[in-house]
Structures are given as structure tokens and as C-alpha cells.
Swiss-Prot record:
This is Maximins 4/H3 type 2. The lineage of its organism: Eukaryota, Metazoa, Chordata, Craniata, Vertebrata. GO terms for cellular component: extracellular region. Transmembrane segments: none annotated. It holds the Pfam family Bombinin. The modification Asparagine amide is found at N70. It comes from Bombina maxima (Giant fire-bellied toad). Residues 1-18 form the signal peptide. It is found in: Secreted.
Amino acid sequence: MNFKYIIAVSFFIASAYARRNEKDVQSLSQRDVLEEESLREIRGIGGVLLSAGKAALKGLAKVLAEKYANGKRTAEDHEVMKRLEAVMRDLDSLDHPEEASERETRGFNQEEIANLFTKKEKRILGPVLGLVGNALGGLIKKIG
């Protein structure tokens, strides 16, 4: 009788241990799924914010380009217009990165491609902020 009791208790302990391990594995996989879902949500929100920022920059660049295109331009205004056109091309290439990267990277090796994209990011953000500041400063001077 004692032997049957020992076997039954051992079986009960082993099955309880197995169930606990199974639940731990399930909770880990559920946690991974939840983390992945939250990462997708964060990426979605980031994508929406990036799209809104790009749209705002494009709109501002178009307004500034129209302003400079309709009036008489000095050499400085002409230079600003050229920069705005370059910014517009860069912003358009952000909307269609595959096409832009195919055009820009033909004949480059992988290291040059990585350097090109790093330079492109710097080339877009720096001048955009500078141009927006200069254009707004120029508009304020002309209005005031």
C-alpha cells in the first residue's frame, strides 16, 4: 500500500511540475505576442507621425516655393528656390525610397550605399530646418 501511495504522489508531483512548466512557456509566448503587438502599435504611431511631419514639410516647402516663384527673385532668392526644389526632391524620395535608392545607388558598393544614406539623412534634416528658418525669417522681415 505504501508503495502505491508513493507512486501516486510521485506521479501527482511530476504532473503538477509539468503543468507549471507548460504554463510558464505559455505565459512567455503570450508575453512575446503582447510585446510584438505593442511594438507594432508603436511603429504604426511612429509611421503616422512621420507621414504627418513629411506632409507638413512638403506643404511648407510648396508654399515657400510658390512664394518665391511668383515674385521677382534676387540671386539670394534664386538660391533659396534651388534649395527648396532639392528639399522637395529629397522629401519625394522619402515617399518612394525603393525608386530613389535604385536611381542613386547604381554602381556603388555596399559601404558607399550605407554612407550615401547616412549623408542623405543629414542632407535632408539640416537644410530643411535651415531653409524653413531662413524663409520664415525672410517673410517676417518683408511683412514687418
